[in-house]
Amino acid sequence: MAVKAGAMIHQGGIVVAEGGFATSGRAALALTAMGMATETIDNTTGADGDQKVQVEKGCFLYANSAADPVGVASLNQSVFIEDDETVSATDDGGARSPAGVCFDVDDTGVWVRFT
């Protein structure tokens, strides 16, 4: 997937589409979660599309939000992007985009399914 100008994408992080280009997940509206980055890509000095990132679909572990934690009531429900490594239970009044579906929650974090 072509990377957005100025983007830094970290291996294992949530990748979103914004304006047709890949960038790191963050709390914002109108982002489309694409999956997990399989590599680190630095396009901080590049233009739109200068770099490409491989994105994988599947079920991956992310940190649980300290401020808006995902609990067992969220199983099989949408969870929301707080940053590229953290998900939350709610969209914070419309301030966050969906990450994917909560597959499981345990002491290590939240298992998010990207389809």
Residue ranges and their predicted role:
Residues 1-115:
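Surface-exposed, low-hydrophobicity beta-strand/loop segments enriched in small/polar/acidic residues
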